[in-house]
Protein backbone atom coordinates (compact mmCIF):
# COMPACT_ATOMS: atom_id res chain seq x y z
CA UNK A 1 0.00 0.00 0.00
CA UNK A 2 1.40 3.37 -1.06
CA UNK A 3 0.20 6.95 -0.51
CA UNK A 4 -2.33 7.97 -3.15
CA UNK A 5 -3.52 4.43 -3.91
CA UNK A 6 -7.24 3.78 -3.95
CA UNK A 7 -8.38 0.39 -2.67
CA UNK A 8 -11.73 -1.36 -2.47
CA UNK A 9 -11.78 -3.52 0.65
CA UNK A 10 -14.32 -6.21 1.46
CA UNK A 11 -14.47 -7.57 4.98
CA UNK A 12 -16.27 -8.02 8.26
CA UNK A 13 -16.54 -5.30 10.90
CA UNK A 14 -16.76 -6.47 14.50
CA UNK A 15 -15.64 -5.39 17.98
CA UNK A 16 -12.02 -6.37 18.68
CA UNK A 17 -11.80 -7.85 22.18
CA UNK A 18 -8.02 -7.27 22.21
CA UNK A 19 -8.42 -3.55 21.43
CA UNK A 20 -11.01 -2.29 23.95
CA UNK A 21 -13.86 -3.53 21.76
CA UNK A 22 -13.10 -0.96 19.06
CA UNK A 23 -14.78 -1.77 15.78
CA UNK A 24 -12.20 -3.41 13.52
CA UNK A 25 -12.32 -4.42 9.87
CA UNK A 26 -11.03 -7.89 9.06
CA UNK A 27 -10.42 -7.85 5.30
CA UNK A 28 -11.48 -10.80 3.17
CA UNK A 29 -10.60 -9.15 -0.13
CA UNK A 30 -8.56 -6.16 -1.29
CA UNK A 31 -8.60 -4.80 -4.83
CA UNK A 32 -6.64 -1.87 -6.27
CA UNK A 33 -8.82 0.49 -8.29
CA UNK A 34 -7.93 3.41 -10.53
CA UNK A 35 -8.12 6.92 -9.12
CA UNK A 36 -10.07 9.13 -11.51
CA UNK A 37 -8.46 12.54 -11.97
CA UNK A 38 -10.65 15.26 -10.53
CA UNK A 39 -11.18 18.36 -12.64
CA UNK A 40 -12.79 21.73 -12.17
CA UNK A 41 -14.67 22.39 -15.40
CA UNK A 42 -16.71 25.31 -14.09
CA UNK A 43 -16.69 28.38 -16.32
CA UNK A 44 -16.63 30.67 -13.30
CA UNK A 45 -14.05 29.44 -10.82
CA UNK A 46 -14.69 29.69 -7.11
CA UNK A 47 -12.27 30.87 -4.45
CA UNK A 48 -11.76 28.45 -1.56
CA UNK A 49 -11.79 30.56 1.62
CA UNK A 50 -11.38 27.69 4.11
CA UNK A 51 -8.66 25.23 3.24
CA UNK A 52 -6.53 23.01 5.50
CA UNK A 53 -3.10 21.60 4.80
CA UNK A 54 -1.33 18.81 6.65
CA UNK A 55 -0.36 21.45 9.24
CA UNK A 56 -3.91 21.28 10.65
CA UNK A 57 -3.65 18.82 13.51
CA UNK A 58 -6.07 15.91 13.06
CA UNK A 59 -7.89 17.62 10.17
CA UNK A 60 -5.68 18.15 7.12
CA UNK A 61 -3.78 15.61 5.05
CA UNK A 62 -2.77 17.51 1.93
CA UNK A 63 0.85 18.64 1.53
CA UNK A 64 0.99 22.41 1.06
CA UNK A 65 2.69 22.31 -2.34
CA UNK A 66 0.15 19.80 -3.71
CA UNK A 67 -2.74 21.99 -2.62
CA UNK A 68 -1.32 25.04 -4.38
CA UNK A 69 -0.46 23.06 -7.53
CA UNK A 70 -4.01 21.69 -7.72
CA UNK A 71 -5.54 25.18 -7.38
CA UNK A 72 -3.25 26.42 -10.17
CA UNK A 73 -4.05 23.42 -12.38
CA UNK A 74 -7.78 23.98 -11.91
CA UNK A 75 -7.42 27.63 -12.92
CA UNK A 76 -8.39 29.11 -9.58
CA UNK A 77 -7.51 32.78 -9.11
CA UNK A 78 -7.06 32.67 -5.32
CA UNK A 79 -6.83 30.27 -2.39
CA UNK A 80 -7.09 30.91 1.37
CA UNK A 81 -4.90 28.83 3.67
CA UNK A 82 -6.70 28.49 7.02
CA UNK A 83 -5.10 25.79 9.16
CA UNK A 84 -6.27 25.20 12.74
CA UNK A 85 -4.54 27.74 14.98
CA UNK A 86 -1.23 27.74 13.09
CA UNK A 87 0.52 29.49 10.20
CA UNK A 88 3.46 27.15 9.44
CA UNK A 89 2.14 26.38 5.94
CA UNK A 90 2.50 29.97 4.71
CA UNK A 91 6.12 29.85 3.47
CA UNK A 92 5.61 26.50 1.72
CA UNK A 93 2.45 27.74 -0.02
CA UNK A 94 4.09 31.03 -0.93
CA UNK A 95 7.07 29.28 -2.54
CA UNK A 96 4.78 26.91 -4.46
CA UNK A 97 2.67 29.81 -5.81
CA UNK A 98 5.25 32.55 -6.43
CA UNK A 99 5.77 31.76 -10.15
CA UNK A 100 2.04 31.61 -10.87
CA UNK A 101 -0.91 33.99 -11.00
CA UNK A 102 -2.55 32.34 -7.96
CA UNK A 103 -3.24 34.85 -5.20
CA UNK A 104 -2.76 33.36 -1.76
CA UNK A 105 -4.93 34.62 1.07
CA UNK A 106 -3.28 33.93 4.40
CA UNK A 107 -5.46 33.15 7.36
CA UNK A 108 -6.26 30.77 10.16
CA UNK A 109 -9.19 28.85 11.59
CA UNK A 110 -9.25 29.91 15.22
CA UNK A 111 -11.00 28.68 18.36
CA UNK A 112 -13.17 31.58 19.49
CA UNK A 113 -14.25 31.83 23.12
CA UNK A 114 -16.47 34.55 24.45
CA UNK A 115 -14.57 35.61 27.54
CA UNK A 116 -11.20 35.31 29.28
CA UNK A 117 -13.01 34.42 32.52
CA UNK A 118 -13.78 30.98 31.04
CA UNK A 119 -10.11 30.06 31.37
CA UNK A 120 -8.91 28.49 34.60
CA UNK A 121 -5.76 30.22 35.84
CA UNK A 122 -2.93 28.47 37.65
CA UNK A 123 -2.58 24.79 38.41
CA UNK A 124 -4.96 22.27 39.88
CA UNK A 125 -3.56 22.00 43.45
CA UNK A 126 -5.62 18.89 44.26
CA UNK A 127 -3.96 17.05 41.36
CA UNK A 128 -0.52 18.11 42.62
CA UNK A 129 -1.28 16.95 46.18
CA UNK A 130 -2.79 13.60 45.16
CA UNK A 131 -0.45 13.02 42.18
CA UNK A 132 -3.46 12.50 39.94
CA UNK A 133 -3.47 13.57 36.34
CA UNK A 134 -4.80 17.12 36.15
CA UNK A 135 -8.15 17.50 34.45
CA UNK A 136 -8.25 19.97 31.63
CA UNK A 137 -10.81 22.72 32.00
CA UNK A 138 -13.12 22.08 29.03
CA UNK A 139 -13.89 25.41 27.46
CA UNK A 140 -16.59 25.65 24.82
CA UNK A 141 -15.30 27.28 21.67
CA UNK A 142 -16.59 28.08 18.21
CA UNK A 143 -14.52 28.04 15.06
CA UNK A 144 -13.81 31.35 13.34
CA UNK A 145 -12.06 32.07 10.05
CA UNK A 146 -9.57 34.94 10.23
CA UNK A 147 -8.14 36.22 6.92
CA UNK A 148 -5.39 38.81 6.52
CA UNK A 149 -6.58 41.60 4.24
CA UNK A 150 -3.25 43.47 4.06
CA UNK A 151 0.15 43.82 5.76
CA UNK A 152 -1.42 45.21 8.94
CA UNK A 153 -3.71 42.18 8.96
CA UNK A 154 -0.74 39.82 8.57
CA UNK A 155 0.96 41.37 11.60
CA UNK A 156 -2.25 41.12 13.61
CA UNK A 157 -2.79 37.52 12.49
CA UNK A 158 0.72 36.64 13.70
CA UNK A 159 0.00 38.40 17.00
CA UNK A 160 -3.23 36.41 17.46
CA UNK A 161 -1.47 33.11 16.75
CA UNK A 162 1.28 33.98 19.23
CA UNK A 163 -1.12 35.15 21.95
CA UNK A 164 -3.37 32.11 21.55
CA UNK A 165 -0.44 29.71 21.94
CA UNK A 166 1.36 31.52 24.75
CA UNK A 167 -1.53 32.75 26.90
CA UNK A 168 -4.61 30.67 26.10
CA UNK A 169 -3.41 27.20 25.14
CA UNK A 170 -5.89 24.70 26.57
CA UNK A 171 -5.41 21.62 24.42
CA UNK A 172 -5.90 23.97 21.49
CA UNK A 173 -4.99 27.65 21.02
CA UNK A 174 -8.02 29.62 22.20
CA UNK A 175 -8.85 33.19 21.17
CA UNK A 176 -11.02 35.30 23.47
CA UNK A 177 -13.32 37.64 21.55
CA UNK A 178 -11.84 40.71 23.25
CA UNK A 179 -8.30 39.73 22.16
CA UNK A 180 -9.45 39.46 18.55
CA UNK A 181 -11.10 42.87 18.79
CA UNK A 182 -7.85 44.40 20.15
CA UNK A 183 -6.03 43.19 17.01
CA UNK A 184 -8.89 43.55 14.49
CA UNK A 185 -7.31 45.98 11.98
CA UNK A 186 -6.65 44.48 8.56
CA UNK A 187 -8.49 41.25 9.31
CA UNK A 188 -11.60 39.75 7.74
CA UNK A 189 -13.59 37.57 10.16
CA UNK A 190 -15.99 34.84 9.11
CA UNK A 191 -17.78 31.81 10.41
CA UNK A 192 -16.38 28.32 10.05
CA UNK A 193 -17.43 24.74 10.66
CA UNK A 194 -19.00 23.73 13.97
CA UNK A 195 -16.56 23.11 16.80
Please tell me what each predicted stretch does.
Residues 1-195:
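Phosphodiester-processing cores and adjacent nucleic acid-binding clamps
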Amino acid sequence: IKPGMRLRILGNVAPDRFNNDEMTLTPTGIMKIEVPERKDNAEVKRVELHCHTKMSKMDGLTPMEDLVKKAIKWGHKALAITDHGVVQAFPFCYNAAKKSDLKLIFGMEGYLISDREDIKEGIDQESVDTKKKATRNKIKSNHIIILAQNEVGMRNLYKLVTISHLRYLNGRPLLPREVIMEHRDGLILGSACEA
